[in-house]
């Protein structure tokens, strides 16, 4: 998962008229979450945990997640490296993002997959409640009272969540680690 910019539908035609050609396709998906975790996913998750010596970690506060913050960004840099247009984050950027965004997370919507032998992060999922309805109610304005709608949306039990960042180390991709992440989100 990678946050990207949005382009209006007429942009591609306009760019082609100007002589540009398409270099890459991007896809966005809306995933409907079932009422419960499918039995097959639970079995796959348990097999993957045993086979690779992994554990699923959840957090209650910023203090508990901070020891893993740098590791998450190392995993992000490695897992996103082959993606089109990705530039590795510098240590200065990582430090900035940790200080800026860790306090704003909903810790119950953060999942880490950690290798038990060395406590290394092999996968992560960071989600937040969808803020679209709150932004509509606030009419796109934070002040004077729009922040109340946003705060309510962030604090209440979400009906829809947005996956902000998800990544798995390349050596663990296509091995079921993503099943562990999604089992926890469901």
Show where each model-derived region lies.
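Acyl-donor binding region in acyl/amide transferases
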Residues: 1-19, 24, 141-186
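A conserved beta-strand-loop-helix scaffold within acyl/acetyltransferase catalytic domains
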Residues: 58-168, 183
